[in-house]
Amino acid sequence: MRDESAKGSRLKANVLRFALALAALAGLAALNAGAQSAQDPAPQRPSITGISHVGYFVSDLPRALTFWHGLLGFDQPYTLKKKGSDEIGIAFIKINDRQHVELFNEPPTAPPNLMSHVCFTVDNVEQMRAYLRARGFDLKPGNGAKTQAGDYAFEIKDPDGTLIEFVQTLPTGMEAQAAGRFLPDTRIANGIYHVGFLVGNSEKALAFYHDVLGFKEIWRGSSSPSVLSWINMQVPDGSDYVEFMLYAKLPATFGTQNHVSLVVADAQRAISVLEARPAYKSYGKPLEMRVGKNGKHQVNLFDPDGTRVELMEPGTVDGKPVPSSTAPPPVHE
């Protein structure tokens, strides 16, 4: 009995020593993990270099192509088919080698909003996903899915629900493969200047675009001295910008507010060129050059669905910058 009691005591002692050893190992592992975590810096945001593209829904693709190709003079280098169909799902309108407009041949997902999304170019999609994940966005590690056009890309939503895409252009993708081609002299403009879209809460929008994405505020404008109308936010590593179209009450139609602005050297000459084209007869709307609140010449056109395409000169009419508005933003209803 004494031997069995001694064996039991030794067994209990061994179990206790083993448990203490496991606890010590666990504590050491936790300590090492904490030290490693302290050493590893938070993921850094990769470069956001510009606007890659903007997408719009169209109800009649042939008419939309007449507008973009016949009137504005841009080429359609490639298309994507609808799933399980030979029908065109997306038509790509090439603006330059790094920018395009996507025409979605389908009903809008959230009418009357005809803007599908806006996409920004980044130099590393995997790093962008890691950066946003560290900022609380629900994103899995990795490059994300390859698009049908052959590039790495993923999407999130901004505070207003606008779909925001980030793309890393790959050498094997359709855009890179088309570099240097599909750039006819008929193009009325050679670049996307900015993209404008509705924003209801400017404070939340600034927290997202400035605090998270690193965009820089470059100008504020007002159509009225009592309330702010627009905030321009430039990408952190380029010259392209987005324009917050501020509102208190959501408008009944979005087409005038949600727009793409194309840069032209001479707005009056652009009007003359457009009016001389056969497609202008079917366009059927007068073209008028105006001076915007930002002091720049601009011309507004509308696609067959009412989405605004703005032609804008890059400089002010007198060469002097227009001061930013100090009016308060509208109170979102």
Regions found by a protein language model. Give the residues of each.
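Bacterial N-terminal signal peptides that target proteins for export
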Residues: D3-L20
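Bacterial N-terminal signal peptides
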Residues: A19-A30
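Vicinal oxygen chelate
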Residues: Q36-S47, T49-S59, A91-K94, P107-G191, F197, W219-S222, ...
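Ordered, small/hydrophobic-rich secondary-structure cores
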Residues: D40, V54, L72-Q76, L80-G150
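Core segments of cupin and vicinal oxygen chelate
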Residues: P46, G55-H100, A134, G196-Y241, ...
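Structured core of small recognition/catalytic domains
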Residues: E203-L206, H210-R290
